[in-house]
Amino acid sequence: IYLFLGAPNERSTAQPERDFYIYMLRPYLKTPFKDEQKPDELFFELNHSDDRFEQFLKRYAAADDLKIDATPAMKNLYQRKIDSYFKELTKWLNDNFVTTFNITYRGKKGSVLDFGMFLPGNATIQEIINIVAEGLLTDWFAQKYPDYPIFGEIKDGYLSKSNLEAYVKEALQCLMGKETRMGLAILNGLVLLDNSNKVTAKKSGYANWVKALLETKGQGQVLNYNELIETIYIRGVEDLQYTKEFRLEPELLVVVLAAMISAGDLEITIDAKTYNATNLNEYVQLPLSKLSR
């Protein structure tokens, strides 16, 4: 997901493609653009404010401007004012976001409440945006990636860069018998549990995909990392990595492979050391950055 400050026609063409685009439209000096009502575009726009917000915004802008040519001593004074005004602006936005911002998705416009979103008490702006995005973009994601796992038991309802590593580590510990709610949520989403919550790789389409690739190999041949993972580069720099089937994050593939090791379906060699069902405990203790590479 990309979060842009501005309109679609202000987005740099150099930016790599993403599955979703969230736009925070300019509240002032608005840029005209045509809403093409795309299923992967979501817009937030400040609909109205009040005198308090306007005053703090003007003071913030003035202090930021005056700081440029100020003496070192005055720069510190203006920076304190900038920080103070920014804090007030942030508080106002947190307190009033639900009632003062409009959402537009596929031509429909309204407030968070108009879209029927359930928000937890004291939700931050980031949490509100995440909840709205999940609620409105989930159907499109399911159409685009129908075989991507559903993690319905995850606390926040979705995986993100900020929580993925923690969930994956818990899932790996579950394979060692240390069951946690977080770990089971990942294993369940990857179809690595039977009806009794026991680990199995037999029913998982993700595990069966890996197994099918292994079966195409001749005796003594190995399945290499780059046969499972697609790496996307932008101007020669690594941007994203996904599995070639299902578009799984490499971290989720680690869980699938670990479950297959546990079941005796495969062995993995990392840095000349081979891991199988007898030393799975050593495998899951490796840094996730090494396991997912």
Region locations from a protein language model:
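Extended alpha-helical scaffold and adjacent linker segments that couple domains
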Residues: 1-293
